[in-house]
Amino acid sequence: MDFANLAAQLNAGTILPEGIVIVTLMGVLIVDLILGRTSSRWIGYLAIAGLLAAIVALYFQWDATNPISFTGAFIGDDLSIIFRGIIALSAVVTILMSIRYVEQSGTALAEFIAILLTATLGGMFVSGASELVMIFISLETLSISSYLLTGYTKRDPRSNEAALKYLLIGASSTAVFLYGVSLLYGLSGGQTELNAIANGIITANVGQSLGAVIALVFVIAGIGFKISAAPFHQWTPDVYEGAPTPVIAFLSVGSKAAGFALAIRLLTTVFPFVAEEWKFVFTALAVLSMILGNVVALAQTSMKRMLAYSSIAQAGFVMIGLIAGTDAGYASMIFYLLVYLFMNLCGFTCIILFSLRTGTDQIAEYSGLYQKDPLLTLGLSISLLSLGGIPPLAGFFGKIYLFWAGWQAGLYWLVLLGLVTSVISIYYYIRVVKMMVVKEPQEMSDVVKNYPEIRWNLPGFRPLQVGLVLTLIATSVAGILSNPLFTLANNSVANTAILQATKVVSTQVSAIPAEKPDGL
């Protein structure tokens, strides 16, 4: 094979955005090695510049004529592009909110950013991976980096405890996922590429076998852990409470987006012959997530734990689009993750600012905050109201698109349950807003009474201000501009071959008469 044919098969230009992130990662480490601690003043901006360059590269790859690279191991189609963009953008905002937080914790900023970029790289590769080995390696890159980030503040015993819990539960979920993947490898006759696995299973007529069902259950369990879906959510509240706040901000968006990208690609490509079965399982997960997440959040006294259960509920809402299995369903998933990026990170930026100035994240301590810090109060109020689905904010339109897609697909009772639990969520969101805004001066918490003077010129506070303002504007404007954003999401689905081919494959599989399988 000559070099030209090899280059054509590799098509390495498809992973140019990931290449930019790798170069940025190496640049961060080299600059820190040369300059030491003095590099912390601007090393965050170097990482942000690299991530923005990667996002620009993704933009120029939109609707590429040949998205397949590395002989089918990675597909840079529009679906992967938009998920990779969400993950990279979440890393940008995370770095903005991390600079002051990490420096104040007494740990090295360069190493933190390097691990965060590694996690971003893993998430981006997961979003386009179409081969079992690449999926597993990318998923482990994201997972191991997340474990390290969770325990990064080594002097904090809560961070160490959170990292240990995350590692133990994460390792268990990885083992379960890997066993499910190994069953797929065996059932397909030794195939590792997703399309080849689906064809091998259909050819061997083992799609309805016990082995295929076990593989499906184990794969869904691994994905459920990554998206924080109940009952695979046990790690979420403790990790959210103990881990550094910028880390959980990234996990709540970047890791969740990677999990949903993997779910769409793996389930629609490999399991079209059991579509009704995996939709039934995800329906159960969605019901549990929406009910448990929203009901348990009512009793929380910590902002971080409240948002942990909120993220579980949000995963339940997003799963409605996945269960619908239509173009509108997938597009509404993508749109909701886009706006969730802005409104959730806006909320976490406010929590970081408040904790840096007061040292607490208890909900009761926010009482009367409006009179001391109007900008922070505005940002947190807008983000919480948007998460609750209050019009005309972005979260309202995100839920409208999800519920409408579910209704069109005949998921009537699931949509009604989503509406009811969404109303429940408004209570615990508005409770915080009311506490910040409505309280009289004499009802201020002791922490707010002693609130320090607001000084944005302190080291590391300016990036936090930029992150807060940008996410606040995006959360407010995304509702008004919901139609262009939904059109973008819809185009990403319409231009993705695997989602369009799934309809044809499902029809063909349903036409095959059921026979007793030869294998498991």
UniProtKB/Swiss-Prot annotation:
Quaternary data: NDH-1 can be composed of about 15 different subunits; different subcomplexes with different compositions have been identified which probably have different functions.
Role this protein plays: NDH-1 shuttles electrons from an unknown electron donor, via FMN and iron-sulfur (Fe-S) centers, to quinones in the respiratory and/or the photosynthetic chain. The immediate electron acceptor for the enzyme in this species is believed to be plastoquinone. Couples the redox reaction to proton translocation, and thus conserves the redox energy in a proton gradient. Cyanobacterial NDH-1 also plays a role in inorganic carbon-concentration.
Catalytic activity reported: a plastoquinone + NADH + (n+1) H(+)(in) = a plastoquinol + NAD(+) + n H(+)(out); a plastoquinone + NADPH + (n+1) H(+)(in) = a plastoquinol + NADP(+) + n H(+)(out)
Localization per Swiss-Prot or TrEMBL: Cellular thylakoid membrane
Disulfide bond positions: none
Transmembrane annotation, as ranges: 15-35, 42-62, 79-99, 106-126, 132-152, 167-187, 210-230, 244-264, 280-300, 306-326, 334-354, 378-398, 400-420, 466-486
Any Gene Ontology biological process: photosynthesis, light reaction
EC number annotated for this UniProt entry: 7.1.1.-
Cellular component annotations (GO), alphabetically ordered: plasma membrane-derived thylakoid membrane
Key words of the record: Membrane, NAD, NADP, Plastoquinone, Quinone, Thylakoid, Translocase, Transmembrane, Transmembrane helix, Transport
Highest taxon of source: Bacteria
Pfam families hit by this protein: Ndh2_N (PF19530), Proton_antipo_M (PF00361)
Coiled-coil ranges (or none): none
Main location: membrane
Source organism: Nostoc sp. (strain PCC 7120 / SAG 25.82 / UTEX 2576)
Family statement: Belongs to the complex I subunit 2 family.
Enzyme class label: translocase
Membrane topology term: Multi-pass membrane protein
Protein name: NAD(P)H-quinone oxidoreductase subunit 2
GO molecular function: NADH dehydrogenase (ubiquinone) activity; quinone binding
